[in-house]
Amino acid sequence: SQILFHKSIDLVNILTNKYAQRDNEKKEIVINNLNNCVKLGNKIIGDNYPTYIIAEAGLNHNGSINIAKQLIDRAVECKCNAIKFQSFEKNSRVSSKVKNANYAEKADGLQENTNEMFNRLRLNDNFHKKIFSYARKKKIEIFSTPFDEKSVDYLEKLKVNFYKIASVDAVNLPLIRKVGKTGKPLILSTGMTNISIIEDAIQEFKKTGNKNLILLHCLSSYPANEREMNLKAINTLKNIYNIPVGLSDHFPGIEISLMSIGIGANIIERHFTLDKNFEGPDHMLSSEPLEMKKLVHFANGSNSILGTGQKIIQPSEYEVINSQRKSIYAKRNIKKGEKFTKKNICIKGPAGGIMPKYIDMILGKKASESIKSDFPITWSKM
């Protein structure tokens, strides 16, 4: 009976994978009542606001409070909006039995498996308190990704203003529910998901009465393959849910982040390191301070760069109109009473005469005065 039970579970998984796309297309999406702008600390996230930049310190502190403080200092210098770490209980993220998930890093000359690495880089109570206190003194928003419910309780004691849930927990509805019940905003990463999975997470979140949700489009591969980034999904999620959407970027450079800002991403999360050459699982795909500074500079100007969407003549263009835009000119000297023809008029710059779109209206009309060659033809001269 146990064998049959497990075989039935396998069959469900096979059918789920086989028909995932069909489920993705057919699943009814309930009209939501989530906020289309969300306040993170003292910043508002949404359309018509500057893109919010999160420096994801993650595990890049390498277990050192000193390095963590340096990451905070550099994030402040880069003018990032927030810095994020990761919080989890010992032996809680992955099974200790996993033998084939080694990272290409060494500790004291020994290869570590994933669980051992997480345990080594886990933030204890003292570590948490010191970096949270330090960041707040430096006037930068600090928060964390909880990977289990106990960590949510702990972060509540540290009075975080909002939460991030990682892509691996997008299917962890109990954790989503736990964060939702805090009443604080949630940033949810959506790597390894489709609309069906995202919809399940959102509906669970909404049951708590919390209306402050931000989605991050994400490609959960490390480093990310640019051909699989599918950045258009950012606007797909925006159009479906009418909430802020951004990008959790695992691409080695900032090019993908810049492109996502260009198509309207409201928030960018990028891994942050002091040195890409440090040993550790995420350093190589992280941004160093100089690169992060460039991203922040672009993001801060993104609102004015993207503009209103209205196609208008900008103030700086009027001078160019006067000096370069074309109008109708006399090709040769034209006598008073002479008819305008294609032989005696032409189109050239600068502006000052009749616009070329009216040329058919003036052909055959007579000049009301003499016009010298290479002078503009105006309505008063007809």
Q: What do these predicted ranges mean?
A:
Residues I3-M382:
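Catalytic cores and adjacent flexible loops of soluble metabolic enzymes
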